[in-house]
Regions:
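Transmembrane helix boundary and interhelical junction motifs in multipass membrane proteins
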Residues: 11-24, 94-104
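Membrane-embedded alpha-helical segments of transport systems
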Residues: 15-16, 41-49, 121-130
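Hydrophobic alpha-helical transmembrane segments and immediately flanking/interface helices
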Residues: 100-124
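Surface-exposed beta-strand edges and their flanking turn/coil or helix-capping segments
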Residues: 104-105, 130-132
């Protein structure tokens, strides 16, 4: 009965996110719509907390000297320069979790509001896509 809370909590974990959270919910027997919504909500809550924390930290620290970026952050920076916040938000989940991607975008100076908006769109799209694939996979296995 409270499985959706477990799905929400799981989806808040980086690398589980809305996509695997939705799959977990479907495999646990939740209604797919409930599983996807719970996964999306959990992922969005954790992402917003990270974005707001990164924004506060950026405001406190002000402009800092350029530091040496890790290879993943360098790749993320190149993606930001090439595709902007929408592209990184939609494609960044193939490289890093939304929490890390969104925090890095804010740290790089992107608009907090824009990051949250595009990350929500991305989280919904990825959650729906993987939730749908999970439903199709379960149906395929059950009907074999």
């Amino acid at each position: 009965m409270l499985q959706w809370l477990g799905v929400m909590a799981a989806a808040a974990i980086p690398f589980v996110e809305s996509y695997f959270g939705a799959v977990i919910g479907v495999l646990a027997g939740l209604n797919p719509v409930v599983a996807i919504i719970a996964a999306v909500v959990g992922n969005v809550i954790s992402m917003v907390l990270v974005v707001l924390s990164a924004d506060r930290l950026r405001a406190r620290r002000g402009v800092t000297p350029v530091e040496q970026l890790s290879p993943r952050k360098q790749r993320l920076r190149r993606m930001l320069d090439r595709f902007g916040v929408p592209g990184v938000s939609l494609l960044g989940q193939t490289v890093l979790p939304s929490q890390i991607t969104s925090g890095a975008l804010v740290a790089f100076g992107a608009s907090t509001r824009g990051v949250i908006g595009w990350q929500v769109v991305s989280i919904i799209l990825w959650g729906v896509a993987f939730g749908t694939l999970a439903v199709l996979g379960v149906d395929l296995v059950q009907n074999s």
